[in-house]
A protein has these predicted regions:
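Localized edge beta-strand/strand-to-loop motifs within extracellular or lumenal beta-rich domains
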Residues: 138-152
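Beta-strand-rich interaction surfaces with strong enrichment in secreted/lumenal proteins
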Residues: 54-57, 128-133, 164-166
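Flexible glycan-contacting loops in extracellular carbohydrate-active proteins
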Residues: 163-191
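Short strand-turn-strand beta-turns centered on an Asx-Gly dipeptide
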Residues: 154-158
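Short, aromatic/His-centered strand-loop micro-motif at the edge of beta-sheets
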Residues: 115-141
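Extracellular glycan-recognition modules
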Residues: 4-25, 33-36, 46-115, 136, ...
């Protein structure tokens, strides 16, 4: 699954069960379902109360990084949904801080656009381009890349947006899948795979979409 990347630089989470992802035991909220899809097994979220919490921040400590998710946003979800959230925890209190990485969708006129957000050390950047709309109910790979100076996001290999920002490395924390970390803005759809790489990849290095079967 590493596709030539060293195991020390990339971590892969396959969503083929709900009790663990990427070797990490999950906290299951609601009743997310393992489903069979043309790509293989995936986890489906109902957009109401389904979520998985994972007790790690897979990009903590990375000065540059690439975050990829293969997912399917459904047609009848809420207008704004948070489908993946990496959150930094305060080591003194154990509470969530404002430092975070987020993947979100916005539904506009029956289609969706990608919203990516990154914040660390008081600096932040939002990438949201709803001029680039995509059909709901299909499988996509979305990607956020930070190269040390610029944050970029992609749907497939197509750049959606970019902006300059200076982000210090994220500190340790945890992750939520299917909802924002504060249990708001649930996601309706399915997630097949995520990959977290501790360097900035170019589009030709991005995770390959599996062949439907």
């Amino acid at each position: 699954m590493g596709q030539g990347l060293g195991v020390e630089t990339a971590e892969v989470w396959m969503f083929d069960q709900t009790s663990s992802v990427g070797g990490h035991t999950t906290q299951v909220l609601g009743h997310p379902q393992v489903i069979e899809t043309p790509l293989g097994k995936a986890v489906q979220f109902n957009g109401v109360d389904d979520a998985l919490f994972v007790p790690v921040h897979p990009l903590a400590g990375a000065a540059t990084w690439t975050w990829e998710v293969i997912f399917r946003p459904d047609a009848d979800g809420a207008p704004a949904q948070r489908f993946f959230h990496l959150s930094v925890l305060d080591p003194a209190t154990g509470k969530d801080t404002d430092d975070r990485l987020l993947f979100e969708t916005r539904i506009v006129n029956g289609q969706w656009c990608l919203d990516s957000f990154a914040m660390a050390g008081g600096q932040s950047k939002t990438l949201l381009n709803c001029d680039k709309l995509h059909a709901l109910g299909k499988w996509y790979r979305v990607t956020a890349v930070y190269d040390g100076t610029t944050l970029r996001n992609y749907v497939g290999d197509e750049l959606q947006g970019e902006g300059s920002v200076r982000l210090v490395p994220q500190r340790p924390g945890h992750s939520s899948v299917g909802v924002r970390i504060n249990l708001k803005d649930h996601f309706k759809g399915a997630i097949y795979e995520a990959r977290f790489t501790r360097r900035a990849l170019t589009p030709d290095e991005f995770l390959k979409m599996p062949t439907p079967h």
